[in-house]
Amino acid sequence: MIAEVKVYTTQTCPYCIRAKALLKKRDIPFEEIDVSRDEEKRGWLVKASGMRTVPQIFIDGKPIGGSDELHALDASGELEKLLHR
C-alpha cells in the first residue's frame, strides 16, 4: 500500500514545481495544497513542519522537508521505502 503524500505549495514557487515534477515522473500520487492565499493553512504549516518555506512535503502526515530533501530521499532510495510501508 502506498503512503499518502501531501505537497504544500504556492503558485509561483520554482521549488514547488521541481518537487511536483519528481513525484509525477515517479508516478507517485499526491495531493497539492496551495497555501498562497490562506493564512490559516500557512500558520498550521509552520507549526507542523517547523519551516516557513514551500514546498513542504508530508508522507503519511510526517514532514520530510522541501524539494531538496525529496530529491535526496529519491536519490538514496529512501523515498521508495517511505512510500511503501
Describe each model-derived feature in a short phrase.
Residues 22, 26-27, 47, 72, ...:
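Non-catalytic interaction surface on structured domains
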Residues 1-29:
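Local sequence-structure signature of Cys/Sec-based thiol-disulfide redox active-site neighborhoods
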